[in-house]
């Protein structure tokens, strides 16, 4: 049987695995599904059409699955889907999607979401992401796997943050950060390749060297973006461990709608 504090409210229709723990004064809505071994802290609210996987930890006073902060929202049954083993700390807010997008906000697995983070409607957060305290994601933001967003940072709507990238604290990000790149500032500017993060994740020296060369092409050689793309295509087929990550970088740049930080 689920371990639910007597002061918690679990609305009829909610589906909780028998191993779920719900703390004092928490509220679980009627359309919520919570997987095994997940814990919900005191005074937290999980509402809307929200699904949580297994082994998640929801901190005190978190608000998960709330209505989108979008004036076009008309009570459609949009969703929030959260994977497994995520930590979502105190006072975090995560909203469901809107019909103007795909109707769903998603978080992957093994994410570390610190206190007072906001994840807006229609955001898509990958896996193994760190969002530091007070980081604020506007609607429709996409964050790749293993990315880090520093505390007190603001991210504009529709911005993409590439895998393995890092945004420094107190930054304002209005354009896309390519994968593997460090950015910081108001407004955020590029500051090199996330070498230490790549080493920790097992990238080979050859792969890191190739990404450093790609960074020079993109940011240091005085090339236009179109000229840089031509040279990146050559680097991406040079042979060796560097091909795959450079191809990932190039594909991200080519797909950018808002433009990349420059």
UniProtKB/Swiss-Prot annotation:
**Could you tell me the keywords of this UniProt record?**
Acyltransferase, Cytoplasm, Lipid A biosynthesis, Lipid biosynthesis, Lipid metabolism, Repeat, Transferase
Instruction: Tell me which InterPro entries the record gives.
Output: Acetyltransf_C, Acetyltransf_C_sf, Hexapep, Lipid_A_LpxA, Trimer_LpxA-like_sf
Q: Which GO terms describe its cellular component?
A: cytoplasm; membrane
Q: Which reaction does it catalyse?
A: a (3R)-hydroxyacyl-[ACP] + UDP-N-acetyl-alpha-D-glucosamine = a UDP-3-O-[(3R)-3-hydroxyacyl]-N-acetyl-alpha-D-glucosamine + holo-[ACP]
Against SUPFAM superfamilies, the record matches this protein to: Trimeric LpxA-like enzymes
Per the record, the pathway is: Glycolipid biosynthesis; lipid IV(A) biosynthesis; lipid IV(A) from (3R)-3-hydroxytetradecanoyl-[acyl-carrier-protein] and UDP-N-acetyl-alpha-D-glucosamine: step 1/6
| Catalytic EC class | transferase
Please give the Gene3D superfamilies that the UniProt record associates with this protein.
Hexapeptide repeat proteins, Udp N-acetylglucosamine O-acyltransferase, C-terminal domain
Name the EC number(s): 2.3.1.129
- Function of the protein: Involved in the biosynthesis of lipid A, a phosphorylated glycolipid that anchors the lipopolysaccharide to the outer membrane of the cell.
Name of the protein = Acyl-[acyl-carrier-protein]--UDP-N-acetylglucosamine O-acyltransferase
Gene for this chain: lpxA
